[in-house]
Amino acid sequence: MKKILVVEDDESQRILYHDEFADAGYEVILAANGREALKQLDVGKPDLIILDIVMPVMDGMETMGRIIREYREIPIILNTAYSSYKDDFMSWGAEAYVVKSADLGELKAKVREVLGESGSHP
């Protein structure tokens, strides 16, 4: 079972992502900010990280920089409500950039693509 670390400050979004990806057959680990995400990485490495950008404590860009330095092999999907960050050179370190939407179809498709999966089930 593939493991996904979801880093999202909005609790309702975290719950939604947990439920959707767990139902799709993934093991889902949650973190509310970048600092929590780095602590989770000390415990075990996921196969993929879904990372929000605008968060308190440690934002997604700082978090991604630290992850890339220490865990370069873990792919990151940036998932944010702000399309403007796509032009930020730091976002180029991510495998994919997905603007948040009520429909999780694009995010789910990117997860499957980045993990090298086809179809709708991991």
Mark where each language-model region is.
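Alpha4 helix (beta4-alpha4-beta5 surface) of REC/receiver domains from two-component response regulators
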Residues: 62, 83-100, 105-109
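Conserved acidic carboxylate
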Residues: 8
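Hydrophobic/aromatic residues positioned on beta-strands within the core alpha/beta folds
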Residues: 77-79
